[in-house]
């Protein structure tokens, strides 16, 4: 196998079930006191927030990876490093009419969450919202189920941000982009995986003691 990881049957099912009417990402909204987010001139510290998030991306490697399909759809997609990863695309800033109230924030959140994530990029977005009443700042999180389940439901904001008055910028290791596998290798690996799926089915069934319903669902998907 190559140096990549493949979606599980469950994670891949989120992609298959997704449609414009049924988005398969999860969302959250948080509201914070705004003082720490603004500089002495009153401007939002967007560049600093992006730098802070960038310094922590190595803690969740998949947040710099995109989906890559298997040729001829002969298997589940894999995660590969995104060579055009752009932190500015994933960490954004918007604003409400001053002073924004909760109803306006929920309307904005609904609009953002109604849009599907771009599958050609890593499947997450963080939207900061300024101009809330009392000078507060909101954070709208948007992360695909296939990605969240793959990192065991990690609280993205807790890992990527630091809400202390003086945030800590980590010193991450240099990110070395790994090239995607050759198409022929990816196809060959998928064929081999399909040939060994009966073993995977047995393994999934044994896991039913820990999670009966989820294990059953995975087994059914692999058989069908």
State where each predicted segment sits:
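Soluble acyl-CoA-dependent acyltransferase catalytic core bearing the H(X)4D motif
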Residues: 1-12, 29-42, 50-224
């Amino acid at each position: 196998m190559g140096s990549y990881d493949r979606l599980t049957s469950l994670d891949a099912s989120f992609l298959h079930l997704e449609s414009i009417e049924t988005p398969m990402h999860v969302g959250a909204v948080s509201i914070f006191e705004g003082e720490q987010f603004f500089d002495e001139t009153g401007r939002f510290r967007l560049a600093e927030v992006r730098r802070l998030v960038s310094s922590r991306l190595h803690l969740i490697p998949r947040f710099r990876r995109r989906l890559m399909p298997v040729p001829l759809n002969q298997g589940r997609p894999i995660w590969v490093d995104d060579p055009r990863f752009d932190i500015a695309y994933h960490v954004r800033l918007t604003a409400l009419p001053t002073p924004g109230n909760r109803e306006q924030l929920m309307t904005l959140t609904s609009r953002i969450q109604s849009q599907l994530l771009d599958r050609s990029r890593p499947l997450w977005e963080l939207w900061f919202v300024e101009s809330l009443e009392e000078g507060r700042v909101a954070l709208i999180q948007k992360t695909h189920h296939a990605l969240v389940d793959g990192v065991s439901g990690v609280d993205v904001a807790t890992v990527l941000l630091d809400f202390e008055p003086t945030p800590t910028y980590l010193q991450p290791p240099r990110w070395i982009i790994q090239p995607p596998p050759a198409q022929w290798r990816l196809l060959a690996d998928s064929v081999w995986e399909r040939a060994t799926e009966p073993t995977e089915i047995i393994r999934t069934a044994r896991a039913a003691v820990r999670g009966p319903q989820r294990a059953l669902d995975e087994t059914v998907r692999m058989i069908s």
